[in-house]
Amino acid sequence: MKLANIKSAKAFAPATSANFAVGYDLLGFAINGVGDTVELIKRDDTELVIKQISGAAGADKLLFDTDRNVATAVIKKFLADKNIRLGFDVYIQKGITLGSGMGGSAASSVAALVAMNAFFETPYSYNDLIDYAIYGESLISGSFHGDNAVPCMFGGLVLLQSSKPCKKIDLPIVDCNVVIVCPNLSIETKKARELLKEPYDLSTIVEHSACLAATISALYTQDIELLSESLKDILIEPRRFKLIIGFYDVQKAAYDAGAIACGISGSGPTMFALVKKQDDANVVAKAMQDKFKEFNLKSNSWISAMSGKGAYILEKK
């Protein structure tokens, strides 16, 4: 593989919201305005060295061990599999809070791979990189699923037909805004997944499957009313809500303020809400944040289109 004539590359990868209420490990969308940045500076040897990790809350807890930090672990695996000898100094800027349910591990994995890819004269396609990003996410979650990594890399709203190997379906986007509210809590993905170990009744699975099918239909037919009726999480939310202080109160506040849907983003504690109008988005965001305040929780909010942009190169030189 011939190398490009550059010494450094910096890439950005967006935050994501996984599950979308009805698609556990299957659905996810990219979020505008927040994400992780990884800069790679080429070394004269083949070592990977993490020089700096900075940024959002929890960044100081991330590991400098290159086998256990997802950003370097995915680069190391890719280079080993392709038998490519390269070394980098690595600088990680976290825009996504640790344990927030906004795809932080996926974003670091994706940003690292996209930055690495810039060093090749003929870059690999994102399809060549995505399995490595999902691998990176699995190091944190303990499960090989791509509902964060795939929308993070490609953007938009995606349905995962398969995570291993990755097979995705790009879904139509409805004309709605997404409100993202992240309270000052942290939830480990592995612990959140442990709450789902007990079997579900078949009737619950059937009802949830109907919600998923109706949601997909609503997206293709652009039926906002059907989408609002269908985005009901009867599978995951009843077991995970207890991890998010004031969850049902915040959810009710979102609906009362005009949201057409509201649920948990990924493993939480971040919550998402869908709104029809831009003006409603600000009202819903404020209502959700005000309700979290009643539980003595500070929070951050973002407003995004569902057609969020995927990962991209910020600079190379």
Label each region the model flagged.
Residues N69-L79, L212, V250, A287-M288:
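Short, well-ordered amphipathic alpha-helical segments that serve as non-catalytic structural scaffolds
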Residues L219-K317:
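Glycine-rich, charge-dense phosphate/pyrophosphate-binding loop(s)
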Residues M1-S100, V114, A118-Y124, F154-G155, ...:
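ATP-binding N-lobe of GHMP and related small-molecule kinases
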Residues Y126-I173, C262-I264:
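Alpha/beta catalytic cores of group-transfer enzymes, especially the acyltransferase/condensing modules
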Residues I41, P151-S163, A273-K276, L314-K316:
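Short beta-strand-to-turn element immediately C-terminal to the catalytic PLP-Schiff-base lysine
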Residues D175-K252, D256:
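Acyltransferase
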Residues T46-V49, T189, D279-A285:
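Short, conserved charged micro-motifs
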Residues A106-F120, S265, T270-L274:
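Short, small-residue alpha-helix embedded
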